[in-house]
Amino acid sequence: MLINENADNYDRETSQYIVAYLDLLGVADRIGRDEGYQKIAMNKLHNLYTFSMKLASEIAIEEYRDIQFKIFSDNIVIAKKLSEQSDKRLLDIKCLLNCVSHFQCLSVGDGVGWLVRGGITVGELFLDEIMVWGKALLKAYNLECRVAIYPRIVIDREIIPEIITNKELSEYVLQDFDNEYFLNYLCIQHFGGQILMNGFTIMQDELNGKFTESIYQKLCWHMNYVNKELDKKNEKRDKKYRLKLK
């Protein structure tokens, strides 16, 4: 006899979603610090989540209203159900990529100053107010913890052809030195040099000069990515802002 089968129809099913699984790096270490620091870190995290969700809900495009969030401590799932119509499907993908880009911009900027790693894929998912389940979640999680390595959000190779053949979507994708594709979140940001530079200062101040080799690699990757994107944008107001290691 199945649990609660008299009251439940057992008719929930997975659907096609585009899914991002994100990990905010260093949160476990922040939890282990003194009470005053913990309080600031906890409130930063809470406001990062609530502001991102509020921003997604307020964007005056219907497709953004269906973006779903599932949060557990320093991990977040952002998902969007995909339409079966090809033109709407591409718009769904764009909405998700844009939403995740906003989240990452907020996280690395001077309002928070934390690095993000993650994975994005398309596949079967079930998501409601109680739980999240499906192969897409597992794939996105594996991309984050086994492939991403650096503070980047890796995009599943299986969906790359669909993205890079669309002019608008292709702006959200870059290929890295190891041939992995990742989210070019700064494609949505303009005149953000000072915000990014100040965010990088926060990251380094938080570490107080105590870098492990792994942390150093992550900081260098982030610094190089941001500086390259600022160089490409070549915006006059941002020419004096570049990230530097202390």
Which residues does each PLM region occupy?
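Catalytic NTP-binding/metal-coordinating core of nucleotidyl cyclase/transferase enzymes
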Residues: 2-102, 111
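Intrinsically disordered, glycine/charged-rich C-terminal tails and inter-domain linkers
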Residues: 2-9, 149-246
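Short, solvent-exposed loop/turn segments at secondary-structure junctions
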Residues: 27, 125, 160
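A short acidic (Asp/Glu
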Residues: 30-33, 81, 128-138, 164-166
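Catalytic strand-loop-helix junctions within cyclic-nucleotide turnover domains
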Residues: 82-89, 119-131
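Catalytic-core segments of nucleotide cyclases and related cyclic-nucleotide turnover enzymes
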Residues: 89-97, 127-144
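Catalytic/regulatory signature loops of cyclic-dinucleotide turnover enzymes
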Residues: 109-113, 117-118, 122, 139-159
